[in-house]
Amino acid sequence: MIVLFVDFDYFFAQVEEILNPSLKGKPVVVCVYSGRTKDSGAVATSNYEARKLGIKAGMPIIKAKEIGKDAVFLPMRKEVYQQVSRRVMNIISGYGDKLEIASIDEAYLDITRRVKDFDEAKELARKLKAEVLEKERLRVTVGIGPNKVVAKIIADMNKPDGLGIIYPEEVKDFLYNLDISKVPGVGKITEEILRKVGINRLGDVINKSGELVNLVGKSKANYLLSLANNTYHDPVESREITHRGRYVTLPENTRDLNRILPSLKRSIEEAYSKVDGIPMEIYVVAIMEDLDIVSKGKSFKFGVSQDRALSVAQELLNKILESDKRKLRRVGVRLGKITKSSTLEDFLH
């Protein structure tokens, strides 16, 4: 298998630069304003000039303005970015047989049948980058690998406007020696848990396989072990984004369940209003007072109805509050694996 991972570099900010060339060379910060106060909210993304100042995604806007006094702060224009994303994804799809859209600015592409080897894949990736730049003026980074995760990792290492490749014979050593923080899906909390027991490189999980499930759960343990043993081969699946979410800013930072539940209920109602089908997964997502993100989820064989969603979400919220002592700033739900119910009997089961 030969997979490309395409990452639209600092996407929202880059689109703003394309639409307004006078922004080029200036620190540009695209923000999500919460509406509490004039500068309440968080940074969605920033260009590399802003990042050099220390401004990064998730940072409170008020702090970003203290750091970047001369930076240009812009509100997020999601509809504009979605239009550009659709056009770019259409270009990318022409270079492979299966396109898996991971997010508004990331995609996996299976090119196994389009090229005879990895050197030819590199040439194809160059052509893809050139066409996107010519038609949309957008710079993207491409990673090439024998599976999705390796392709993503090498892309992350070659930003911005880069092209990275890992050949099959290099994968085993590359993954074994990879710093655990570089593994997709390993966040700050998981990283801390793993480092405490001496897991600093991905290869270290092999010697800790017996205790790994207790540390990070069965699903993540299996994922990490399959990567470390070079047996990860999840295919690229032809699909667009199959989740819907809605997040609400709380009136004030709090841990009080009674103050959080009305906002959680509202986010459920709005998320379900956008769904055309039955979600098989539900996640509660909490943005903490320091803008760290914590989530808990649950899967259902036959889906979860809106009527049932609130009780499930409350259960997941309780788990977050029990495991984390910080106050919540925002709360919401994400509905995943949205599908059509085969029969009414299945859905009501």
Curated annotation (Swiss-Prot):
Matches recorded under SUPFAM superfamilies: DNA/RNA polymerases, Lesion bypass DNA polymerase (Y-family), little finger domain
Pfam family, one: IMS
UniProt entry keywords in alphabetical sequence: Cytoplasm, DNA damage, DNA repair, DNA replication, DNA-binding, DNA-directed DNA polymerase, Magnesium, Metal-binding, Mutator protein, Nucleotidyltransferase, Transferase
Cofactor: Mg(2+)
Record-annotated disulphide pairs: none
Family per similarity comment: Belongs to the DNA polymerase type-Y family.
UniProt name for this protein: DNA polymerase IV
Organism of derivation: Metallosphaera sedula (strain ATCC 51363 / DSM 5348 / JCM 9185 / NBRC 15509 / TH2)
Taxonomic lineage of the native organism: Archaea, Thermoproteota, Thermoprotei, Sulfolobales, Sulfolobaceae
